């Protein structure tokens, strides 16, 4: 949903939904209301001293990440932040969520904005089904039944004629999907799904501090619990990502970039699509501890799209909170990288140059205290979106079927490392929408049924959903677009590189290859792609409502590295030959 990097990064909110920055943190938790924070310890601090400081400030630790020194704390003390921040062992703190609010029918302003912009990912959805949405029968030798619909795999030569001939991946290579979960029972994921190592680091959040529904009532869950199993995806995003990386060659549906590697679900995203700090860093440090080789991160950490340490638009409290997000996330990235994890992240879908000043009106997008709403901020280039702009992260932009940078993809010379196909439904000769110019990957059947996208006989009734059957086994797939779809294709190539060149991992089994080597090969084997000529590229889109949208993005840099494509478009075949 909207919290992913598949949505527009910079939303324009209605004026009534905005509050000036001075108001944003004037709203405080009512006395006695239990609130949750994340507290970051000073590097090298004695954990016992930090724990004592939290207790002295009126907090109770409910979870602790000892790898980087981050604790989740509950408290009823409205002065907790000020009290704990004065301790020598504490680096900073940030709101996590309020607990125990009463559900109402209200919707948060940021959620309303999200509903307007999430069409970036699902543009074209809702059209009637085409006649050929169900496939069966025998494909060409070694090709999957839906291979002809995978223009994205052809673009990076992850095909039967390309990389599959030389390297399909090694079962011992582990790719962590830090996302909303993975449907481990999907027929085109299950053969490569590692349930033993998969974890869910989240707890469902029924409502925010304003009473707006977030994940919904826990009693409405299939298991009537706020703790989902580690093999489900009640959103659809994580399943699409996992399938793009490693759907097997099994005579059903599609194949991923690395069809023989193992997928590990490292769930850090809520059902609603929010990604909070503690689950995100827990997923990263766990990845390092258990021997994950590559992780894909197609999201940003809420509630701030951009984190600034000294933005005059923000209150001192907001600046301190954003500094905590930056420091804690970077510690987790450093930890995972040092443990041998290659970090791949989506560049974002705001259609913005991240090396230039922009305006963000979407943050804070989650109400941690009653009355909190997003407000407009001018964002200098020094502010960062985490984890995509973190050190050690390979930032991936998105291309369409023609190899142009997708209209929604963020860009910036020095920000983008590489490019990969993520789809562009307006990359058509007439600049009109074609859902098949998105990317096709696995879709949980339960969600397709819940959303009314299947007929009584199981056939899809919408154009963006495709069914593939092998005997009595049927699986579903959907078209999506976004840098969230580009990033896993790059992560899949990274997994192939580890499979091809990795050495035995004596600690965890399987293979291991230093991230710096993986990144070097990934960039060196990418197809160099120059800026368009002229570099100011105009995107024209004829929208379904009859209106026309025209935007211009300026590409800076050389063919060797530029703001649209970085070092080039990933090439699976060149990476493994």
What is the predicted function of each stretch?
Residues 1-24:
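Secretory targeting and sorting signals
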Residues 27, 51-149, 404:
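Autoinhibitory propeptides
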Residues 29, 62-63, 291-299, 476-477, ...:
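C-terminal subdomain of the subtilisin-like protease fold in secreted/lumenal serine endopeptidases
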Residues 36-46:
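Short, surface-exposed ligand-recognition loops at beta-strand->loop->(often short) alpha-helix junctions
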Residues 38-39, 63, 72, 92, ...:
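Structural recognition of the beta-strand scaffold that forms the well-ordered cores
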Residues 135, 140-260, 282-324, 349-367, ...:
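Active-site core segment of subtilase-fold serine proteases
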Residues 163-170, 255-258, 274-297, 307-312, ...:
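Mature extracellular/periplasmic domains of secretome proteins
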Residues 204, 369-495, 573-574:
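Extracellular S/T/G-rich loop segment that most often corresponds to the catalytic His/Ser-adjacent loop
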């Amino acid at each position: 949903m909207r919290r992913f990097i598949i949505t527009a990064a910079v939303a324009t909110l209605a004026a009534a939904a905005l509050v000036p920055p001075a108001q944003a943190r004037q709203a405080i938790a009512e006395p006695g209301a239990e609130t949750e924070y994340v507290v970051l310890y000073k590097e090298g601090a004695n954990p016992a001293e930090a724990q004592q400081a939290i207790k002295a400030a009126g907090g109770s630790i409910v979870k602790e990440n000892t790898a980087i020194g981050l604790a989740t704390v509950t408290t009823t003390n409205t002065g907790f932040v000020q009290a704990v921040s004065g301790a020598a062992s504490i680096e900073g703190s940030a709101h996590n969520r309020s607990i125990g609010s009463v559900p109402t029918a209200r919707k948060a302003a940021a959620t309303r904005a999200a509903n307007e912009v999430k069409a970036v990912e699902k543009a074209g959805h809702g059209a009637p089904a085409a006649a050929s949405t169900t496939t069966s029968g025998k494909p060409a030798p070694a090709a999957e039944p839906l291979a002809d619909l995978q223009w994205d795999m052809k673009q990076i030569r992850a095909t039967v004629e390309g990389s599959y001939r030389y390297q399909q991946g090694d079962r011992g290579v582990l790719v962590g999907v830090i996302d909303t979960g993975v449907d481990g029972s999907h027929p085109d994921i299950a053969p490569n799904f590692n349930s033993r190592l998969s974890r869910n680091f989240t707890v469902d959040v029924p409502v925010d501090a304003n009473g707006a529904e977030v994940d919904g009532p826990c009693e409405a869950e299939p298991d009537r619990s706020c703790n989902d199993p580690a093999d489900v995806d009640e959103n659809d995003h994580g399943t699409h990502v996992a399938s793009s990386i490693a759907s097997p060659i099994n005579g059903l549906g599609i194949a991923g970039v690395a069809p023989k590697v193992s997928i590990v679900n490292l769930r850090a995203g809520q059902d609603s699509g929010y990604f909070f700090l503690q689950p995100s860093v827990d997923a990263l440090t766990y990845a390092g501890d258990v021997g994950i080789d590559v992780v894909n991160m197609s999201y940003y950490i809420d509630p701030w799209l951009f984190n600034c340490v000294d933005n005059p638009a923000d209150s001192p409290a907001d600046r301190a909170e954003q500094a905590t997000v930056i420091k804690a996330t970077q510690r987790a990235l450093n930890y995972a990288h040092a443990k041998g994890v290659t970090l791949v992240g989506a560049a974002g879908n705001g259609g913005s140059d991240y090396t230039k000043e922009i305006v963000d009106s979407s943050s804070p997008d989650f109400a941690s205290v009653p009355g909190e709403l997003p407000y407009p901020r001018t964002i200098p280039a020094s502010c960062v979106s985490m984890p995509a702009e973190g050190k050690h992260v390979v930032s991936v932009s998105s291309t369409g079927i023609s190899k142009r940078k997708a209209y929604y993809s963020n860009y910036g010379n020095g920000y983008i490392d590489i490019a990969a196909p993520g789809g562009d439904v307006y990359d058509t000769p007439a600049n009109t929408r074609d859902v098949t110019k998105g990317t096709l990957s696995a879709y949980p059947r339960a969600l397709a049924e819940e959303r009314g996208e299947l007929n009584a006989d199981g056939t899809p009734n919408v154009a963006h959903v495709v069914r593939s059957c092998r005997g009595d086994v049927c699986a579903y797939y959907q078209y999506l677009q976004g840098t969230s779809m580009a990033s896993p294709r790059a992560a899949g190539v990274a997994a192939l590189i580890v499979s091809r060149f990795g050495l035995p991992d004596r600690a965890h089994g399987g293979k291991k290859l230093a991230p710096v080597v993986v990144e070097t090969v990934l960039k060196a084997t990418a197809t160099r792609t120059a800026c368009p000529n002229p570099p100011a590229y105009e995107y024209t889109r004829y929208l379904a409502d009859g209106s026309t949208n025209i935007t211009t993005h300026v590409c800076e840099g050389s063919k060797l590295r530029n703001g649209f494509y970085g070092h080039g478009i990933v090439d699976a075949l060149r990476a493994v030959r």
